[in-house]
Amino acid sequence: MSRHQFDLIMCLKQPGVQTGLLCEKCDGKCPICDSYVRPKRKVRVCENCSFGKQAKNCIICNLNVGVNDAFYCWECCRLGKDKDGCPRILNLGSNRLDRHFEKKKKV
């Protein structure tokens, strides 16, 4: 997700012990590169992202309830991108915001 949309901001704080979750729509994606191939290492999120209501949401889309554990792909683990920090997306993208206001105009 963050690879293709440059306006998305990742948390990147020191990861804790809590595992990141993905919704059914995002299930199987690597949170760094959106690859569905060769999942390897579980995603760990920071303490701020694993607290309260956010703890149960998907770490990529942040809209749906997370059901399955998130994994980094083999390539991101090989390149060391799994050690960059917490991969949770903090903001909505400009595409989603524009879509929201376009729907509001039509009503």
UniProtKB/Swiss-Prot annotation:
Subcellular location as annotated: Nucleus
GO biological process: mRNA splicing, via spliceosome; response to xenobiotic stimulus; spliceosomal complex assembly; U2-type prespliceosome assembly
Pfam families: PHF5
Keywords: mRNA processing, mRNA splicing, Nucleus, Spliceosome
GO CC annotations on file: nucleus; precatalytic spliceosome; spliceosomal complex; U2 snRNP; U2-type spliceosomal complex
Main location group: nucleus
Keyword Nucleus part of the UniProt annotation: yes
InterPro entries in UniProt: PHF5
Role description: Required for pre-mRNA splicing. Involved in regulation of drug sensitivity and may play a role in multidrug resistance.
Similarity annotation: Belongs to the PHF5 family.
Subunit (UniProt): Component of the spliceosome where it interacts with CUS1, HSH49, HSH155, IST3 and RSE1. Also interacts with YRA1.
Protein's name in the database: Pre-mRNA-splicing factor RDS3
Naturally occurring in which organism (per UniProt): Saccharomyces cerevisiae (strain ATCC 204508 / S288c)
Taxonomic lineage of the native organism: Eukaryota, Fungi, Dikarya, Ascomycota, Saccharomycotina
Gene name in the database record: RDS3
